[in-house]
Amino acid sequence: TNTTRPINNLDQKDNTKQILWGDTHVHTTYSMDAFYMSLPMMHGSRGAFPAAFACDYARFISQLDFYVLTDHAESYIPRTWKDQVDSIRQCNAISGNEDNPDLVAFIGWEWTQAGATPETHYGHHNVIFKDYKEGQIPDRPIAAAGALSNVLRTQLADVNRNLFLLDPLNKDYYLSFADYLDAILSTPNCEEGIPSNYLPKDCYESATTPGELYAKLDDWGFDVEVIPHGTTWGFYTPQAASWEEYTQTPDNIRPDYNSLVEIYSGHGNSEV
């Protein structure tokens, strides 16, 4: 049966809302953990996929209305951040009429924090920008400081630099992985005490708490949504972690940034 579903119900007089389907948490292999899992040794994949694949997958496979690139900020280098931004702009450029596109792509990142105790644990947050044009997004992502950042940037490099020795037939993939690890480690840290929008483009910026993240976003002044993600699951969440601890510091709660909170994703459920 070939049934056509109208986009709008024209008989409805007050048709002010429309249900849209999208994904606010899309990773590419620019995220170090995803790159690692894409290596042939892990499950037979063939190396890293470019950001443009996310656009094609959202449009032709998932048939979404929108998606957001939110790779781990801790895995970014200046070149890959530029690649992601360019891919979003290219995706939107081929989406048809700007007033009624077939797909809308947004840019952002995942602030990937984990604390050892409930008092220092804030979890991951997806940072999503309303616009994607030049001058409407930050020059660089803002990562989370702490242990998980160290794993994504330093420890993976220390452990996995010589994987090609275990699988020499696919050594080119592992050498590319090692090159990316080296590029991450060679990115200098941003100088502290300088407003985010005055820092150079090619440094690595981080924030220890949500409040510090919001203060840096304030420096830019762009429209942005920050969605807490996976706050109660995962190997990195300490026992007894709760919103009660999270909200002890007023700076961590910003209604102008936090109008949404994730309840469920494919990773797990915050209600159980």
Which residues make up each language-model segment?
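Extended, charged catalytic domains and RNA/DNA-binding interfaces, predominantly
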Residues: 1-272
